[in-house]
């Protein structure tokens, strides 16, 4: 009432109406995304305003691309997207977990319980679940020689939730090998050193790992070689063309001879830089060696002519992000001047060749020694397939990186959620005094949304599945769900593992957002940018 006195145009939802609006919004977003969860999840088709179509089952992509107007749903979506930004996965799980927490809370609130009591129970349950997670995790030793098999299992688990089984299994080796390629002991893993390049060509199963680099342009001279072996590679950021001064300078001449002399001097300056590169080539190259110049700046036609005459391959306008990758892949160093070129500045590659696809040219730099950068070359018959594979590969790379940094994994297939629920009900609930027990119970039951949704998406009976899993856990057996037949399965033997950091972030963020939403007792649309114009 007081808000309406201050602003007659304000829209206000009070107490139970506000609470039920937030709960319904959370449940609505949950219903949209829950069918995507797991290997048996379905695909959503997003149609844009201009008619463009996007096919995806990646929760992060859906939440970013969808137009969400409800404020509660926007808040949940931002939390889920932040989950992906931090840990690389768990977007869909976050949304359905928050939705289930709200759904479980609604039952208690409808029976007269105050939301504050539930929030207190959520906080107790969250702390207990995080402590249980630390005891439940499986340590993985990540020294100089990493356990490649466990990394493959984690990557396979992630990729199978995004792609069909055959392609996911093929990409598993590619993803693991690419992360191990760029990994340096005692240093953080920089996934930007893995170039993800795509070619609209052939089929998705033709996707491969290139231990080197693929540049999305070719040489600009018809006489340059299209294939060369045993290549010395000069990575440089030097202008091999006439360019204007960076300061606002002008030149004046009084006759044509002076102008001609000035043009000749400018040309001579560029030619001298090119000749220094040619001198280095003659110094280091034997009869069977070749020389490649990859320049971030331009190379003009006369300079290309000089290089081509000496059998040098010249690539210009290389992207800035590829300069660091080239040095890591091929060795040597990127130079900003040709004045003091030495053989130590050069990298090496066993094979450099150009591939032409339609009007596009690609240059492959392969057979490098000890690469610390690589390229995942994604192929597919159409843009929809390529976009799906890209999303999956990015999630796969993050899952492998997380495993190496966490040095532990968590049993998947819903095993952790069922075990945590049993722990909360059988151990933690007894230690809680008063009505906060109901908050702990609601939190415990909300954890079951993951195995329930996995079973539902696989076409299984959810009640039978949950009863079967909980009875096994009561016997002391840690089991997950076999999506093929609905029977309990040992995730460790089946090789189904989740990331520890993803689970931890999920348990941390879910109850916090749910608690904030439960404590909303008024929704007021009266902000300055929302106010309706008055006459």
UniProtKB/Swiss-Prot annotation:
It comes from the Eukaryota. It is found in: Cytoplasm. Its main location: cytoplasm. GO terms for cellular component: plastid. Pfam families: Cpn60_TCP1 (PF00118). Keywords: ATP-binding, Chaperone, Cytoplasm, Nucleotide-binding. GO terms for molecular function: ATP binding; ATP hydrolysis activity; ATP-dependent protein folding chaperone; unfolded protein binding. Gene3D superfamilies: GroEL, GroEL-like equatorial domain, TCP-1-like chaperonin intermediate domain. Belongs to the TCP-1 chaperonin family. Heterooligomeric complex of about 850 to 900 kDa that forms two stacked rings, 12 to 16 nm in diameter. Molecular chaperone; assists the folding of proteins upon ATP hydrolysis. Known to play a role, in vitro, in the folding of actin and tubulin. This is T-complex protein 1 subunit zeta 2. It comes from Arabidopsis thaliana (Mouse-ear cress).
